[in-house]
């Protein structure tokens, strides 16, 4: 029952600029609903991976072209993760989505940690999904059944598909597991 202030490095890194220029000026950066700047980590099949502080509001395509210097070997984007491993993925034809909280949410994902992972046209998306699910299965704290059991099942199904033993029913089973776990998990 005591006052608490919780900030992350990203918030604290904005303080010197705000002190020097004012909060009013900072709020002019970005776009309505997503003002200021944000640090995004860009990785995957880009020519220039790294961490970049940008004004909110540009499209993911602009971000990848400007800061990532495009895709390696001039390939096309097959998919990208807009906000870290737990964020729903976007396809390569969704590069025009603006990097704002509302635009990304309205498109069905989240900015989350700001970790943008780009996958080119040669990426096996089943293997990519399995890699992420394996991480979550391994890192699960085990407190809630949907996460503890669900990620293990997702991992097994994706492994079956990746090894060529997948069944058509695996798709509906994957979707069912995802929809069941979403409202019942503890971690939000």
Identify the meaning behind each predicted range.
Residues 17, 52, 65-66, 89-96, ...:
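Short acidic, glycine/serine/threonine-rich loops at helix termini
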Residues 70, 99-129:
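Ubiquitin system architectures
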Residues 178-188:
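Single conserved hydrophobic/aromatic residue that forms the stacking wall/gate
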């Amino acid at each position: 029952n005591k006052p608490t202030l919780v900030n992350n490095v990203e918030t604290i890194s904005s303080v010197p600029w705000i002190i020097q220029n004012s909060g009013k000026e900072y709020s002019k950066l970005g776009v309505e609903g997503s003002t200021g700047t944000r640090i995004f980590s860009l990785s995957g099949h880009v020519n220039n991976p790294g961490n970049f502080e940008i004004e909110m509001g540009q499209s993911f395509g602009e971000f990848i072209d400007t800061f990532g210097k495009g895709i390696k070997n001039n390939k096309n984007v097959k998919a990208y993760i807009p906000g870290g491993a737990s964020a729903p993925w976007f396809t390569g034809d969704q590069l025009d989505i603006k990097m704002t909280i509302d635009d990304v949410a309205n498109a069905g994902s989240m900015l989350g940690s700001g970790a943008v992972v780009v996958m080119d046209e040669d990426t096996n998306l089943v293997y990519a999904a399995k890699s992420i699910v394996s991480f979550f299965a391994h890192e699960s704290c085990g407190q809630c059944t949907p996460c503890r059991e669900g990620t293990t099942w997702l991992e097994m199904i994706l492994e079956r598909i990746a090894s060529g033993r997948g069944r058509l029913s695996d798709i509906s089973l994957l979707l069912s597991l995802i929809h069941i776990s979403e409202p019942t998990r503890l971690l939000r």
